[in-house]
Amino acid sequence: MKKKNLITAALPYVNNIPHLGNLVQVLSADAFARYSRMMDIDTLYVCGTDEYGTATETKALIEKTTPEELCNRYYAIHKSIYEWFNIKFDIFGRTTNKSHKQTVQDLFLKLEKNGYITDKESEQFFCQQDQMFLADRYVTGECPNCGNNAKGDQCENCSKLLAPIDLINPKCIICKNIPIIKTTKHLYINLPKIKNELIHWMQTTEHNTNWNTNAIKTTNAFLRDGLKERAITRDLKWGIPVPKKEYENKVFYVWFDAPIGYISITKEISKDWESWWKNNKETNLVQFIGKDNILFHTVIFPAIKLGSKENWTMLGKLASSEYLNYEHLKFSKSAGIGIFGNDVITTGISADIWRFYIYYNRPEKSDFQFMWDDFMERINSELIGNFSNLVNRVLTFYKKFFGDKIDTIEIKEDFWKEINLKYDKTLNFFKQIELKSALKEILDISRIGNKIFQDKEPWKTKDSTPKKTKELLLNLIYLIRDLSILISPFIPHTSDKIRRFFGESYEISNKFLGTNLGLNTIQFTEVLFTKLEKELIDSLKLKYSGGKNMQDEQTENPINLFSEKVCLKVVQIKTIERNPDAEKLFILKLDDGTPDGKQIVSSLADYYKEEKLIGKHIIIVDNLKPAKFRGIKSEGMLIATEDENKNFKVIIVEDFKDNPIPGERIILESDSDKKLKLPSKISIDKFLKTQIVAENGELKVNGINLILEHSKEKILSREIPNGKVY
């Protein structure tokens, strides 16, 4: 068994204020680090800010400051928020530290020496006005997939990953002029050459038991599709300079330098850093990330280390989490939607309450919506009504009727057998980084304690059988001590407070669990928490919901919206041509049951060959406002399903319906007896707010099935049974 835990949380970008969803990784890693220390494992928890790259450079332009000044300001903001949340880093550093440049350049030179670096020419936007190549976020335009405004790396509206040259009507963000396409030269890491070593490492690291399901699926899909050489340089000023002739004016891509930041930040506090990072036999590297960062930690960072041919500590356990969202809305600081780290501090609600709720709902296997009403309910019922109630009622009752002194108890099986089994279960959940399950197991133990107190009715027996009643209460007091230890990774301030009740006579250590050690007196007691009041929660909900118009717009009932505003129809694909100005765009001529038919433009070339689609019946948004894509008119949008691993499939009607009829409308099952009007034209934004999903192979809006208007057959998604539909 490895003796040391080296724990990292994904380095947050330092160009914004973190919201609740951004805090999941640092909080998760903090809980695991505290558990690790509790188990007397040598532990180092490393994190810091990711400061280089386009996001920082463009944010500095917008705020009319320098990247250095921007990073200094946001680093201080991040640090203060994490301190308020009581996150116990061993170091919270920065990728602009002195050792980072040397560490990144040194690894690059080793990769080059070992033959893993190539160079290639590529086409990139160049701004003639500003005389510079434009990295992805320096370009804005229309998304070729949904027509919305998008940056050159990804469309925030439909989540489509993009390259800048995919954008329609591209513009430079600095001068707003139209850039030209120009050839530039970049360095690449040769991932195909490292593939065999990468796969061998994955097999020996037992990733199937040490990584969660989403990480395994995402990584295996990436490897199955074939590794490609990946650019590691960019035409920017704010970054680590490339130590190679002819590339002096370029910097390393932030995805290349950021993971190396874990190493360089460790160097800042430990001369003995190699005992952590070059000690694969004794050190277990545990990394906490969001699902959007999986491949950088399972493929890219390991490939960099393997390619250097040095004895690096490799990834052991990977804990990737899903997204924490806000009241079915998008977090937006400018619109006042959602609660951000600096807002949390001003609510008057303690850090441990926030920590408890985030762990209780940690998005381990699926996304989670933060809801104010649920927040109040869980805190009042679980943290206060269950855990805090046990601590308060037992200690105050004992102190009142039996005094301050705590006697040593005899550990009896009838009281402790079930509880000790639950201790083992809790510690195993911690070990497997199933933090939500660990917390809920602790709350189950607390419930057992409350039930024992209630069932035994010590208020009735204290006079008739005082010795037996005292023994019962003493067992419950030792149970409370154990709960304060087990729950300390989640709510450390509260755990310390309980320890102070007992004069801090024991440590946060697993060696005390289930024993009669470490308790002498109850020095004082007080209520741990007060209940959250509805008036406070309602005021916070209103405060962080955005302006009224925006709130009404974003929370419009999806069912009413679909019934009144959306018209989906079955169409047959008659012909497909490629757009001469954009090879990825198909021009589809459709039979929609009308004499003239329809034409739509869709970016399907990466997913389908023309012959696979011609003659098939698909579903389109029939009443979408017309748009032009690279000069070609589009009169609608086909709908497709995408799963969490970005697998994408067009919904083919033949998969579930014989002899489809072009022009037949798709409606909600609840509207099957209604006479529906044809709605007016709508924007893509309005359509996406209907939130159509595939659930167990069936298309639904808010749980209601979509069906064919005449045959009443359900609309199915055979190839991707669960995912979002757009």
UniProtKB/Swiss-Prot annotation:
Its cofactor is Zn(2+). Keywords: Aminoacyl-tRNA synthetase, ATP-binding, Cytoplasm, Ligase, Metal-binding, Nucleotide-binding, Protein biosynthesis, RNA-binding, tRNA-binding, Zinc. Pfam families: Anticodon_3, tRNA-synt_1g, tRNA_bind. Residues 562-667 form the tRNA-binding domain. GO terms for biological process: methionyl-tRNA aminoacylation. GO terms for cellular component: aminoacyl-tRNA synthetase multienzyme complex; cytosol. Its main location: cytoplasm. It catalyses: tRNA(Met) + L-methionine + ATP = L-methionyl-tRNA(Met) + AMP + diphosphate. The keyword Cytoplasm applies. The keyword Cytoplasm applies. Binds 1 zinc ion per subunit. Its EC number is 6.1.1.10. A motif ('KMSKS' region) lies at residues 330-334. Homodimer. PANTHER family: METHIONINE--TRNA LIGASE (PTHR45765), METHIONINE--TRNA LIGASE, CYTOPLASMIC (PTHR45765:SF1). Belongs to the class-I aminoacyl-tRNA synthetase family. MetG type 1 subfamily. This is Methionine--tRNA ligase. It comes from Borrelia turicatae (strain 91E135). The lineage of its organism: Bacteria, Pseudomonadati, Spirochaetota, Spirochaetia, Spirochaetales. The gene is metG.
